[in-house]
């Protein structure tokens, strides 16, 4: 089959998936549909929860392994959609629907590239993995299926990157902060205001800058994104809760940043939700990155998180669609973007020597 036929298959599958609500933790019906198509294309597969994987029939444990990966879950549709988010509509080159851009286009394009590469000469094994719960970094997503997969040497993650290679990705750590005071009547000089107790620490957090800045990822960034305190106007609040969003570059591990904050923010109590989502990258001299450069693609660093953070091997993001369309109303992807992605994946993989 020519690329056009594979593109048609990709578009058909994408429309089917858009029509199936697959918000994180509810991907079972979408996984069923994917399994149906894998059977139709004679691709024996494994399944763990709502994660699916397919390995090449000429598997050789003595060869290195490349994984193509994308996720099947979506976020919830925002209120400002002007269309039915679960009704796939094609208007010319545009396909509208929830998950079309993030990450449906990458999902179907990586699968078609996998199908093509089964018939091309390779010195490596190829594996395709569709993962669940990516949008929430859930325990039943990639981390659940990873122990069941063979050893992987390198991966391409099909996130929307405007088909440019994101060879580095910032890590993420979410911290819950608490300040404590003593309640009292606001009209009298009594009580200890928990909001005021937190102010010095929050001002320090706002003004502090980590010294080591990354060429690809920039500086490690900390933002207070949620704050909750007080019950009514005439009561001095005795507790304050806030959330810190921390985006780390490759120079700072999440554990180090957390311990550093605990030493500096002495008025507040801090609790990290997880340390596992570290910054990740692939060396610029890696054969796959060199193939990207030969193709005229421009490597960059991504501030957003993906399943790449959970991969203990070299990986980078490369996929159709634009990151700015993700999680937005009237989400869309272009058919031409999917076709170009399939062609690009095949170019990178066909001449690759691992």
Language-model-detected regions and their locations in the chain:
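N-terminal helical capping/dimerization or prosegment-like subdomains
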Residues: 1-77, 239-243, 257-260, 335-346
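Metal-dependent amide/peptide-bond hydrolase catalytic core
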Residues: 2-5, 167, 174-354
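Buried hydrophobic packing segments
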Residues: 34, 107-117, 145, 198-201, ...
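Short glycine/proline-enriched coil/turn segments at helix->beta-strand junctions
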Residues: 39-44, 48-50, 62-63, 119-123, ...
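A structural signal for short hydrophobic beta-strand segments in well-ordered beta-sheet cores
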Residues: 45, 88-90, 224-227
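Active-site metal-coordination/substrate-binding segment of hydrolases
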Residues: 63-127
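Hydrophobic/aromatic beta-strand patches that form the interior of the parallel beta-sheet core
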Residues: 66-68, 129, 154-156, 316-318
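Acidic/histidine-rich catalytic neighborhood of metal-dependent amide-processing enzymes
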Residues: 108-174, 178
């Amino acid at each position: 089959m020519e690329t056009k036929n594979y593109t048609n298959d990709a578009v058909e599958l994408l429309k089917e998936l858009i029509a199936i609500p697959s918000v994180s933790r509810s991907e079972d019906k979408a996984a069923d549909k994917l399994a149906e198509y894998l059977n139709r294309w004679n691709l024996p597969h494994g399944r763990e929860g709502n994660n699916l994987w397919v390995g090449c029939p000429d598997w050789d444990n003595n060869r290195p392994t490349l994984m193509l990966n994308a996720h099947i879950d979506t976020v919830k549709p925002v209120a400002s959609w002007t269309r039915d988010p679960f009704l796939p509509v094609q208007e010319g080159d545009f396909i509208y629907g929830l998950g079309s851009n993030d990450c449906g286009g990458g999902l179907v394009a990586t699968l078609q590239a996998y199908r093509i590469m089964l018939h091309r000469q390779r010195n490596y094994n190829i594996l395709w993995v569709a993962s669940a719960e990516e949008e929430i970094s859930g325990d039943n997503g990639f981390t659940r299926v990873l122990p069941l997969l063979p050893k992987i040497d390198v991966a391409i993650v099909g996130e929307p990157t405007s088909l440019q290679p994101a060879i580095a990705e910032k890590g993420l750590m979410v911290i819950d902060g608490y300040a404590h005071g003593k309640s009292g009547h606001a009209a009298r000089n009594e009580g200890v205001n928990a909001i005021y107790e937190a102010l010095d620490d929050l001002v320090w957090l706002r003004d502090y800058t980590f010294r080591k800045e990354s060429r690809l990822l920039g500086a490690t960034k900390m933002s207070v994104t949620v704050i909750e305190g007080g019950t009514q106007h005439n009561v001095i609040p005795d507790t304050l809760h806030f959330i810190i969003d921390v985006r780390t570059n490759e120079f700072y591990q999440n554990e180090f940043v957390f311990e550093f904050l605990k030493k500096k923010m002495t008025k507040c109590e801090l609790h990290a939700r997880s340390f596992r989502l570290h910054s990740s990258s692939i060396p610029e001299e890696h054969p796959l990155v060199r193939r990207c450069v030969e193709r005229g693609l421009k490597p960059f660093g991504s501030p957003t998180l993906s399943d790449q953070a959970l991969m203990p091997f070299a990986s980078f993001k490369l996929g159709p669609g634009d990151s700015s369309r993700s999680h937005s109303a009237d989400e869309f992807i272009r058919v031409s973007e999917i076709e170009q992605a399939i062609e690009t994946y095949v170019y990178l993989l066909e001449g690759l020597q691992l």
